[in-house]
Amino acid sequence: MSLADQALSYVRAISPYQPGKPITELAREMGIPVEKIVKLASNENPLGMSPKARKAVEAAISGIERYPDQFDLIAKVAERCGVSSNQIVLGNGSNDVLDLIARVFLAPGRSAVFAQHAFAVYPLATLSTGAELISTPAKNYGHDLNAMRAAIRPDTRIVWIANPNNPTGNFLPYPEVRAFLEVVPKDVVVVLDEAYNEYIPPAERVDTATWIKDFPNLVVCRTFSKIFGLAGLRVGYALASTEVADLMNRIRQPFNVNNLAIAAAVAALDDHLFVADSYELNRRGMEQIIAGLKRFGLEHIPSHGNFVTFRAGDAAVVNQKLLKQGVIVRPIGGYGLPEWLRVTIGTEPENARFLEALEKAL
């Protein structure tokens, strides 16, 4: 009998998360120089990190021997989101806070609801607690809130919602989300994952943090990995009622966000010009990519994120041909979409390189 046999059966049954292929890995496999590889697989900001955040990181290095103090970032998030500091939970990326929510509310004998084609971390977080995962059929490749409401059982403790959804980019109109909150049992936590919130057109965007006072069972999760360009530093946060935030903070590791991440995130929240430039680059890039997909006669899913998902036919073959040309995109067969690929919006030259490679791969 091995040590693995002593592990929890539901942990042994979990399939590990498969991230986008790193540039260095493709360079090793294909012998392609790193500088000739274009990675459009992980929804990272093609502009990199905010200049203000970079300066803050450089300044913070001098105090790296000290344990982190989350006060400044919590205060900045509270100011930005209009909540009190005791409603905020910081995480080592938003995946960390998603996992904290699962650990607080899920256990064997309980269940969580999520939508087909939704973010892979929801099943991981759920199944790692021994809880049952209830998957509901997608509607136009996104969430069907009516089906999700119908799937809630007496033992359900969490409903996972990504808005916009990853990997499909679908966006749920805010009135529909609020109407869903009105009918969900008050003892069921609704997790609203807004990793791509800043890519929603400003005229359409609603600050759902203001809803928490009306719906104490709502938890809003956001990240600095996308438009703020801090994916490698790993920092995100949850906004919740004081009661829920307190429970999450009880099991949170004491120093789960490092000094450099805290300094960068505080500065990034003040770099409004960088965020505006990133949004505009994404808007133009989305138009460029979609125009190319239409030119090739490829179906795509309308996206409110910094990526677009398109039907590639034999996606595995197309993906391999792209890799051989030094272009990395994201296969999403693991999300139940074996014929589709997801491409991150890059800079204008990166997008052009992708479209050129895709035309050759089709």
Curated annotation (Swiss-Prot):
- Which residues are the signal sequence here? none
Give GO terms: molecular function aspect only. histidinol-phosphate transaminase activity; pyridoxal phosphate binding
Sites of N6-(pyridoxal phosphate)lysine modification:
K226
Q: Kindly provide the name given to this protein in its UniProt entry.
A: Histidinol-phosphate aminotransferase 1
Similarity remark: Belongs to the class-II pyridoxal-phosphate-dependent aminotransferase family. Histidinol-phosphate aminotransferase subfamily.
Which cofactor(s) does the record list?
pyridoxal 5'-phosphate
Q: Which gene encodes it?
A: hisC1
Pathway assignment reads: Amino-acid biosynthesis; L-histidine biosynthesis; L-histidine from 5-phospho-alpha-D-ribose 1-diphosphate: step 7/9
Instruction: Summarize subunit and interaction data from the UniProt record for this chain.
Output: Homodimer.
Question: InterPro entries of this UniProt entry?
Answer: Aminotransferase_I/II_large (IPR004839), HisP_aminotrans (IPR005861), HistidinolP_aminotransfase (IPR050106), PyrdxlP-dep_Trfase (IPR015424), PyrdxlP-dep_Trfase_major (IPR015421), PyrdxlP-dep_Trfase_small (IPR015422)
Q: Which UniProt keywords apply?
A: Amino-acid biosynthesis, Aminotransferase, Histidine biosynthesis, Pyridoxal phosphate, Transferase
Q: What is its EC number?
A: 2.6.1.9
> What NCBIfam families does UniProt report for this protein, alphabetically?
hisC
Catalytic reaction annotation: L-histidinol phosphate + 2-oxoglutarate = 3-(imidazol-4-yl)-2-oxopropyl phosphate + L-glutamate
Organism, as annotated = Dechloromonas aromatica (strain RCB)
A biological process from GO: L-histidine biosynthetic process
For the protein in the UniProt heading, the enzyme class is: transferase
Q: Which top-level group of life is the source organism from? A: Bacteria
